[in-house]
Design a protein with these regions (language model features):
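A short beta-strand-turn-helix
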Residues: 2-20, 60
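Thiol-based oxidoreductase modules, predominantly thioredoxin-like and allied folds used
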Residues: 3-5, 24, 36-61
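Short pre-active-site segment immediately N-terminal to redox-active cysteine/selenocysteine motifs
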Residues: 18, 24-28, 70
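Cys/His/Pro-rich metal-binding microdomains
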Residues: 30-33
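Thiol/disulfide oxidoreductase modules built on the thioredoxin-like
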Residues: 63-71
Length: 72
């Protein structure tokens, strides 16, 4: 599982040769924790899509940039 930050977002997402599934999440979010195993399974089952996670508490600039108002 790829951890996406403001430092690697451009390289890992915008310049990726593959489609990218980005999961915006937070450790305090119960539904996010419920979805996490499903997101992890998607990442393991396919190599056609890159899967990454953005912790909205640690990367609030990215959450703001993409107008993430609530999660999940």
């Amino acid at each position: 599982m790829l951890t996406i930050t403001k430092d690697n977002f451009e390289q890992e997402v915008l310049k990726s040769d593959k489609k990218v599934l980005v999961d915006f999440w937070a450790s305090w979010c119960g539904p996010c924790r419920m979805l996490s195993p499903i997101i992890d399974e998607i990442a393991k089952e396919t190599d056609k899509v890159k899967v990454g996670k953005v912790n909205v508490d640690e990367e609030s600039d990215l959450a703001t940039q993409f107008a993430v108002m609530s999660i999940p």
